[in-house]
Amino acid sequence: MENAKMNSLIAQYPLVKDLVALKETTWFNPGTTSLAEGLPYVGLTEQDVQDAHARLSRFAPYLAKAFPETAATGGIIESELVAIPAMQKRLEKEYQQPISGQLLLKKDSHLPISGSIKARGGIYEVLAHAEKLALEAGLLTLDDDYSKLLSPEFKQFFSQYSIAVGSTGNLGLSIGIMSARIGFKVTVHMSADARAWKKAKLRSHGVTVVEYEQDYGVAVEEGRKAAQSDPNCFFIDDENSRTLFLGYSVAGQRLKAQFAQQGSIVDADNPLFVYLPCGVGGGPGGVAFGLKLAFGDHVHCFFAEPTHSPCMLLGVHTGLHDQISVQDIGIDNLTAADGLAVGRASGFVGRAMERLLDGFYTLSDQTMYDMLGWLAQEEGIRLEPSALAGMAGPQRVCASVSYQQMHGFSAEQLRNTTHLVWATGGGMVPEEEMNQYLAKGR
């Protein structure tokens, strides 16, 4: 971006200066509305989410047999919700900032099949596509036992079709593993940030991995192009897919059920704050949408991004969405948080969700490494760096009197708050790699 343009952008949005300087930044969204007001802009409804629930239930018998690790939950792919009181104390000590209420961790990092939040959206979109093809071919009805999809006849049928996706790693893992299991030919276009072990794991499942020297945006574009020339190839579009988004959104009702089971209350007197790591935006956007449908105005969602890849904060704050990239303002998009190394946000998610998100913040790679180490020490839970992005949220919210006043939170409401950090990945990181991460923490 030329200097004059840059100067006028900074004059209009002074916060951009802090982003350019790679400062850890917090922006509380002044444009937040009620759910009733913000919902129409999403373009999806409660019914769409219910349909996604129903589809996953139809596939449950299949998943329970195809992936024995899901058998115990009857083929439902869901993660644990755990309290992390020792980590809460450690954060308070390190940041000299009390965190009111209770701190919980949502362990999507340990979801079965692919060990990340992408096991929600990625697997769902592959299943939705498989169902559509099988229904259209007259091989399946909605009332069938879907475990029949494991038969050689179906494998043969699906092998005529292929799936392509562009990914920094975790989405590729979930889509690659699921597609290969169903019988699709699958190609994952991986950006330069993708970890070697993720590529190796995909290849071990018979997935074709195409590697790029460039970032996520290029991998997605190339994947899209490659798919266009083949009518039997379905491209899963991480930047714009409503189906992926709905796969993530199912998490809202599921979390509500987990809260009920644990006897936790979310209402006007007991607000819920959720901190979601954000790459291109589909995962956190879909989850936040589901949470809003489940808990209404009593849930407050925040997106967390690396200082080197603040694409969603930049897009929503300036209102330019996918018309601006972090590279345009001189940021390199290089971060250890490979799952979040995205330079240009999803225009669909930014525009759909900007009224339903309370804020956005950035944190440095070093902060992620530090918190990765603290969590391992205090709670014995090991995550990959990007999964710690949410962990910086509670102290930012608790430290901001202006945010608390903007929403009219009383001292009592803050005392009764639940802070939920969404851990997005790390359950399948090889030991050797994990030890390298742990060595970088302070």
UniProtKB/Swiss-Prot annotation:
Which GO biological-process labels does this protein carry?
Answer: D-serine catabolic process; isoleucine biosynthetic process
Keyword Lyase recorded: yes
One GO MF annotation is:
D-serine ammonia-lyase activity
Q: Which Gene3D superfamilies match?
A: 3.40.50.1100
The enzyme's E.C. designation: 4.3.1.18
Query: Where does the record place the modification N6-(pyridoxal phosphate)lysine?
Result: 118
Cofactor entry: pyridoxal 5'-phosphate
| CDD domains associated with the record | D-Ser-dehyd
Recorded catalytic reaction(s): these are: D-serine = pyruvate + NH4(+)
Q: Could you list this entry's UniProt keywords, alphabetically sorted.
A: Lyase, Pyridoxal phosphate
Highest taxon listed in the record's lineage: Bacteria
Cystine pairs annotated here are none
Stated family: Belongs to the serine/threonine dehydratase family. DsdA subfamily.
Q: Read off the NCBIfam families from this record.
A: D_Ser_am_lyase, PRK02991.1
Question: What does the subunit section of this Swiss-Prot or TrEMBL entry state?
Answer: Monomer.
Protein name in the entry: D-serine dehydratase
Q: What is the lineage of its organism?
A: Bacteria, Pseudomonadati, Pseudomonadota, Gammaproteobacteria, Enterobacterales
Give the gene name.
dsdA
